[in-house]
Amino acid sequence: MVLRLLTADDADVFWQLRLEALRNDPASFADSAEEHLKTTVETARERLRKNDPASNFVVGVFEQGQMIGTAGFFRRPNNKERHKGHIWGVYVRPQSRGKGVASALMKEIVRRARELHGLEQITLVASANLPAQRLYKALGFESYGLEPHSLKIGNEYVDDVLMVLWL
């Protein structure tokens, strides 16, 4: 398993994996597959081109040269919120789950975030995905709130669990 920062050269596979994530786990993401299909690989390339290890990056997990998971991190740009970072878009392919991939991915994001001067907390949103919530708690994240009906998919609502890791 290889973990590394994604670059603009990874845009094609990142865009495809994001689409897979949105299709496989729609309740875990605010974006929909339909919305994602309105974007282009070039949009993903531009996002990855703007990666900055000090404030905004995406980490990919690779096994035998294939990307099997991703997670992103961003830090608030304004002075009053620079003490906060946020993890987004955590996804591991179904066939790679239960093998420690998500744990390794999250630990890498947290490791990189801990190196950032002045960062005091990392937040994330956990959906109804109980295995993900258990992983986040095992890594030291704690719940600080619940956003009821955060997402609406068709006629069903999804509540989000708000979590924080104090650094």
Predicted regions and their residues:
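Extreme N-terminal starter segment of soluble prokaryotic enzymes
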Residues: 1-4
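Acetyl-CoA-dependent GNAT
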Residues: 8-9, 15-16, 20-89, 93-94, ...
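Glycine-rich acetyl-CoA-binding "A-motif" of GNAT/NAT acetyltransferases
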Residues: 66-69, 131, 157
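Conserved N-terminal glycine/acidic-rich loop preference
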Residues: 86-88, 105, 131-143, 148
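Active-site acidic-Proline motif in GNAT/NAT acetyltransferases
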Residues: 93-95, 99, 127-128
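Residues forming the Rossmann-fold NAD(P)(H) cofactor-binding site
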Residues: 99, 103, 107
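Conserved GNAT acetyl-CoA-binding A-motif
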Residues: 113-126
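Conserved catalytic-core motifs of GNAT/GCN5-like acyltransferases
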Residues: 123-125, 137, 142-158
